[in-house]
Amino acid sequence: MEKSYNIFLLYKSILKPIEFVQSINRVNSFLLLLPIMIGSSVMAILNFYIHSDQIHTFTSLNFEKISCIIVGVIGAIAPLFTIMGYFCFYYVVSLFLVIESEKLKRSIFFISTISYTPILFASLLNVLLNIFFEYRPTGFTNLTFLSIDFPNMTAIFAEIDIFKIISAFLLGYLFTVTFSREKIEAVIYPVTWVVLNVLVALI
């Protein structure tokens, strides 16, 4: 029978993830994913209202409500794209490494979800900075403030985000420790992930 853990103790096990990750169940995965989706949705709605107040886009109350709902849904779904991207990348890596584990997919999904939290924190930070400073659609935690006349440069700078990089390296660490890999792999995989994202931004 799978052992269940209190959701508030999840991060306490980040330094000893092997036994913890291998003991997780579907309920714990959902309990961790749910607040991330809710938090992301709230951040998206707040950011939407901050931007809307500045440019006065609303023409009616109904339009405002519909727009808010759409933004909230998109905000809730957005983390899934990153988490599934993490999952697919590391699942392919695990296939190449021939990693054998009864809970391989579940473990990768779980550590992918944990690793998204720095990005969620960045969303909160950007909302706060947008409130107290001039609104910046692309956020304050990346390099988009640099003005360089080069195609797709804004998209590239958006990927060079300190919290996205922290997220990538956190996942690399959790992956290598959970599956007993070499320490150097905790650097190789995150760097590869960041480079791939930059290359995709160039397309």
For each feature predicted by the language model, list its residue ranges.
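Alpha-helical transmembrane segments of polytopic integral membrane proteins
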Residues: 14, 86-90, 168, 172
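Alpha-helical transmembrane segments with an aromatic anchor "belt"
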Residues: 64-133
